[in-house]
Amino acid sequence: MTPEEALQRHWGYGTFKPLQREAVEAALAGRDCLVVLPTGGGKSLCYQLPAALGRGLVLVVSPLIALMDDQVAAAREAGLAADALHSNLEADHRSEAYRRLAAGQTDLLYVSPERLLVGDLLEDVAGRLILIAVDEAHCVSHWGHEVRPKYRRLAEILERFPKAARMALTATATPAVQEDVCAQLALRGPVRFIGHPDRPNLVYRAFPRRDQSAQVLEVVRRHPGEGGIVYVQTRKDVERLAAKLEGEGVSCAAYHAGLPAERRRRAQDDFVHERLDVVVATIAFGMGIDRSNVRYVVHANTPRSVEHYQQESGRAGRDGGPADCVLLFAASDLALHRALALKDGALAPERQRALERQLREIGRYAVAPVCRHRLLAEHFGAPYPAEGASRDGESCAACDVCLGETKSLSAEDALLTAKQVLSGAWRTGGRFGTGYVVNLLLGRGDERLTRNGHDSLQVFGLLKGSGEAAVRSWIDQLIVQGVLEVSEQREYPLLRITEAGKALCRDEGTVRLGVPAPPAARGRKRPKALRKGLASEMSPDEELFERLRQLRRLISERLGVPPYVVFHDSALVEMSALKPKTREALRGVKGVGDRKLERYGTAFLDVISGRPPESAASRSS
């Protein structure tokens, strides 16, 4: 069986995604390789397809224990002999997995790094092993955004299997991280398959954070009944924001490491099984999530690096449909990240420099009035637009800047505005906080300003026509660009002009400033974005699509697996557009392989022909 035949038979696709076939062929030829593909780019198929060809055992090392059982279920639905071994596995399931492994009946085995390092597993896999795939490989890198000590010990295990090919896979890796991954895993002359990091189906927006709850609610209301993730920095804010959304009638749950394990498990299961629309969480949530139809991700606080943002926002739109990624920025978030990193003492100089670089880069992404897609692509060392991509001039038409929701000031206006803001901090001697300087520039003569005589300064009311939101945003932008800084003195954050800021006031240097449009002009809901994006050249039947979703939910609940394991939304969209009447016609739908056709074909054809989902569900095996 050829790779193309296996792709059609097991997964129901006639063509590979970019770089998939090349990675599969390298693995089958015994070559070590590094695979960097964006989320939704089909990384898992790069190691699953070699397992489907039946030439030996493929071992997958993954830190995502919460996801393994769902990954095994999905692989089995594709007709693969798959198992998992991890610490959360029940004893009888573990024994059965070992029995099948010893009998040579397993083609694809998922293990956690902790389980692999125990040692007793190695003898069971040595004889048949053809490929070791290390998923989420950025976790091994000293420069990665999620360093995991157990991952850094994998090289010593890999050395015990010199005949097995090695494949390192990740969605998020700068050129420096790519080099480090290859070194840490001792990849031997690796072939590198580096996909373009851009996700054109994602609409990126970054706005100043003013009223966190109201701004989050604005996004949620644009997506009624659709799946979304809201990331918040602290546990307290998770609880507060989740309660606020619930009070507004939103189906949501809180998730953070301080909650009981059972409550966390229930929130995750309800979200993955589409019984829940929204999860409000710290970054503890998401690594074990494989819900492909997440329509939006909101960062209500700024993440600590561009790498974190790329990975977390990348959980949206994995089905290829359009999705919204919104970042609410405040410079105070960066200060908090810095404080948390230093809470246990000073960092080594190398790590301190890396931290400052990461904070500077995510700050620049959030405030620079530059195409967000371009900023992300260039951060990961990729040109933008990608070679062969169709773009209308320089506009991506998929971010707040290119959509005109954030306006860029001219160079002359930006310099003048920056000088006006800087003068407010300079004339007050750096002895007051941001709120005080904002009031000064807006001409709000409160008691403190009057008492200090600052209402008589020439800068008083200098920006009174600009509005508080714009002035606060400009202060944050100038902090990111290093011409203002916030320093702690007696636990009070004071706004000060830097030497670079003083130089700018002397016309030495340049600055870029943007101003967000009013909320009413931003991010209006597009009609049925999911269906439009997944079937741009089709005319899906909306009512039939919903009935097919209902059937999928009934089947998935009976089987105890997430809905995507049965069929992805993209397959349901195509079914609702093409309305196949025969099993052969249904087999032509992308994502309908032989096993799924056999198990679910009759039930889905029944619903397409008009049978109620409740009745048709009993016709699936």
Task: Mark where each language-model region is.
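Accessory DNA-binding and partner-docking regions appended to nucleic-acid-acting proteins
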Residues: 1-6, 354-356, 386-621
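Helicase motor core with emphasis on the C-terminal RecA-like subdomain
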Residues: 1-10, 14-18, 22-34, 38-44, ...
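Solvent-exposed, amphipathic alpha-helical segments
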Residues: 22-26, 30, 361, 420, ...
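Generic alpha-helical structural context detector
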Residues: 25, 183, 311, 326-330, ...
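Short helix-to-turn junction characteristic of helix-turn-helix DNA-binding domains
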Residues: 27, 220, 271, 366, ...
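Short, charged low-complexity linear segments at domain edges
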Residues: 350-385
